[in-house]
A protein has these predicted regions:
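Ferredoxin-type iron-sulfur electron-transfer modules in oxidoreductases and energy-metabolism complexes
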Residues: 24-42, 62-95, 112-139, 265-266
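Iron-sulfur cluster-binding cysteine motifs and their immediate structural context
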Residues: 48-73, 92-125, 171, 178, ...
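Feature captures the FAD/FMN-dependent oxidoreductase FAD-binding
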Residues: 78, 141, 146-150, 198-247, ...
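Glycine-rich dinucleotide-binding loop and its adjacent helix/turn
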Residues: 125-141, 199-219, 242-305, 413-423, ...
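N-terminal Rossmann-like FAD-binding beta1-loop-alpha1 element of flavoenzymes
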Residues: 146-171, 295-303
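Rossmann-like dinucleotide-binding cores of NAD(P)H-dependent redox enzymes
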Residues: 169-172, 176-211, 299-346
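FAD-site-proximal beta/loop scaffold in flavoenzymes
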Residues: 251-283, 368-442
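A conserved FAD-binding loop/helix module that cradles the flavin
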Residues: 438-465
Length: 466
């Protein structure tokens, strides 16, 4: 193994990106990726710690020092194999995981210098493998047991990937016409190209995972029939119901949930209209309510659809924005106007109920709340009207209650999430497991992957003891 650099000797390798002026005009991916030399240089910054704290921050338990060490030996395909031992979706995770809050936050190098760019190295390795490697056939003895996975998002795919390696017969049911869940309908092409998701799904198919699309458990398929057909079931149905702010005018024409807006553009390709059947209205001035990753995706999508002015309306300050730092930075580069310390009071409309603006309450930060974030407090008598012709609400989502309503034996919380055993993913119904946003509420892709893997282990333990 080549010697690692001394602490701080090599600066963090910045990944090149397309210019804001260029990328505002299309949906092509923004980061250009590391070259082999950049990846090699970045890998040398890793100290190969005896106690790898970075791994403590990875829900998928990727062996981070080991895959980076293989990059340092320029064994890029071996590095990809090492990641895929525990994570079936490295191309997605390398692009959309909040590494600054997880693995990179715990990087020892980061205590004094910039942390090792773990996410960018994962992205490099995944892309290198896709371009240079042939998929290896999975060789595993089948155990004769069948598992049904409901929902083909990150949690379901991760669960399927682990179970197929353990010898189970795995069938994934998906309500939509495309596999990938939020990776396909929620995250824009410029952040996660759909061909990458399709590639990783194809690898799962080659491993033996079976997929059935346009299948809605609880509607087109009876849940009890599924329980009889399969030895275990995993619920990875996500959190697809949008939350709204409940202010006057929310029913006006020109108000969208981020879910609808992004699904039209991402899943149905509306930005290509009239080449595709699904249209999208190209608004001139757009306000996005919220400050998370979905809000960033929505505002940057509006920019690419030709909006002259796009606002983020957020009730706290820049410091409290929950979105990934990279997404915030890219949105600012692309000209999005961030209106901090503003909360929506009313959506304004004309005589035909078309949106003409949003009235906001000026806020200030008060004492910290239960999560440690300072609570926004209204500044009495101070409001601001912002002229827009569209409002996109991106303040969160909740799980679809369809299965829970059909199967009252499945215990849920007040928020509609499944009650599970945190260690195994087991629900209140024997043989039924759950994970991802359906169990924890709207969260990140990597947390969903971690949940899917945990449930796969729980299912294996459960069926091994039957």
């Amino acid at each position: 193994m080549p010697p690692r650099s001394k602490l701080g000797e090599i600066p963090r390798q910045e990944m090149p990106t397309r210019s804001p002026e260029e990328r505002r005009k299309d949906f092509k991916e923004v980061p250009l990726g590391y070259t082999e030399e950049q990846a090699y240089q970045e890998s040398l910054r890793c100290l190969d710690c005896k106690v790898p704290h970075c791994m403590e921050g990875c829900p998928a338990k990727v062996k981070i020092p080991e895959f980076i060490g293989l990059i340092a030996e320029k064994k890029f395909l071996e590095a990809a194999k090492k990641i895929k031992e525990t994570n079936a979706l490295p191309a997605a995770c390398g692009r959309v995981c909040p590494q600054e809050e997880q693995c990179e936050q715990r990087c020892v190098v980061g205590k004094k210098f910039e942390p090792v760019a773990i996410g960018k190295l994962e992205m490099f390795v995944a892309d290198y493998e896709r371009k240079h490697a042939q998929h290896e056939d999975l060789k595993v003895e089948k155990n004769g047991k069948k598992v049904c996975i409901i929902g083909a998002g990150p949690a379901g795919l991760a669960c399927a990937g682990d179970l197929i390696k353990l010898g189970y017969d795995v069938t994934v049911l998906e309500a939509l016409h495309t596999i990938g869940g939020v990776l396909m309908y929620g995250i824009p092409e410029f952040r996660l190209p759909k061909e990458l998701v399709a590639h990783e799904v194809e690898n799962l198919k080659k491993d033996g995972v079976k997929f059935r699309i346009n299948e809605v458990a609880g509607i087109s398929l009876d849940f009890e029939d599924l329980r009889k057909e399969y030895d275990a079931i995993f619920l990875g149905t996500g959190a697809g119901l949008p939350a709204f702010v409940n202010v006057p005018g929310e029913h006006f024409c020109g108000v969208y949930s981020a879910n609808e807006y992004l699904t039209r553009v991402n899943l149905m390709g509306a930005y290509k209209f009239p080449e595709v059947d699904t249209p999208v209205i190209r608004h001139k001035k757009v306000a996005v309510l919220g400050g998370g990753n979905v809000a960033m995706d929505a505002c940057r999508t509006a920019v690419r659809l030709g909006a002259e002015k796009v606002y983020i309306i957020y009730r706290r300050t820049e410091k409290e924005l929950p979105a990934r730092l990279e997404e915030i930075h890219h949105a600012m580069e692309e000209g999005v106007d961030f209106r901090f310390l503003r909360a929506p009071l009313e959506i304004l409309g004309d005589e035909n109920d078309n949106v003409i603006g949003v009235r906001t309450q000026v806020m200030e930060l008060g004492e910290a709340d239960a999560d440690g974030r300072r609570k926004p407090v209204a500044v009495e008598g101070q409001t601001e009207d912002i002229e827009v012709d569209a409002v996109i609400v991106a303040i969160g989502t909740t799980p679809n209650p369809l299965i829970a309503r059909k199967v009252p034996e499945l215990q849920t919380t007040k928020k509609g999430t499944y009650v599970i055993n945190e260690e195994t993913g087991a629900t209140s119904m024997e043989g039924v497991f759950a994970g991802g946003d359906a169990a924890r509420g709207a969260a990140t892709v990597i947390l969903a992957i971690g949940d899917g893997k945990r449930a796969a282990a729980g299912i294996d333990k459960y069926l091994s003891n039957k």
